[in-house]
Amino acid sequence: MSRLLAPHLLAIGSGKGGTGKTLISVSLAQALAFEGERVLLCDADLGLSNTVVHLGLDSGGDLAGVLSGKRALADAVVTVPGAGGFDILAAPAGSGALADIGEDQAKRLVDTLRAAKNYDRVILDLGAGVDAVTMHFAASAEDALLVMTPDPASLADAYAFAKLLKRRGARLPYLIVNMAANDAEARRTSGALGTTCQAFLQSVPEYLGCIPRDAHVQESVRRQRPLPTLYPQAPATAAITVVARRLHNKIAPAPVTIRASGLR
């Protein structure tokens, strides 16, 4: 793809735990890399970092060093090996070492990530829930992506995320429904959230698609490998690829055509 002047920040969040948000973040990072994007996945779940576990890595780089200013971003990231490689920046898995950072430090991290012009996209894997730092990351990104499930409890939590995002002056997030039995169930779920948001927020999240229930997903988690690498033909991988292409097409610069009369 044509290179952007600055990376596009995509914050991936959920109103609650258990939605499969981190697996979606890891899978989208690889799927977008397959689309030709230079991707950095930043584990912004500062209280319970676990992207490293999903990827089977010994280290996810040195996020603490970047936050403290002791490490340059370029020296602190780790490249995920294999086809469709991307970089990752995380704290040690499950350490909770960065759980107490404030919004000022979160802002400095966003500024650092936005200045990383060697990437086309930075994905922020947010913590579950709607605490102040999580919502700061979500509102600071160019776009947020909300992951919800058909679980009725997920609707209230997803609405809380959307409401707080709008309260911070950001537009409503994109939406995907994970662990759906079928497309009809996913659309009912997204429709219910859309109805609530329209009634109280006067706008509706843009639905990007659903990720079906798929036994390959849990197997990829167990084997600590990205789903698109391990099971490229799985139904969930196909769905992730559709979402990735929709996201990619939203930021890919339009090609410049040269005609006899000049640039158009």
Features from the language model and the residues they span:
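G-domain G4 guanine-recognition motif of GTPases
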Residues: 15, 149, 173-188, 210-217
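Conserved C-terminal guanine-recognition region of P-loop GTPase G domains, centered on the G4
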Residues: 155-170
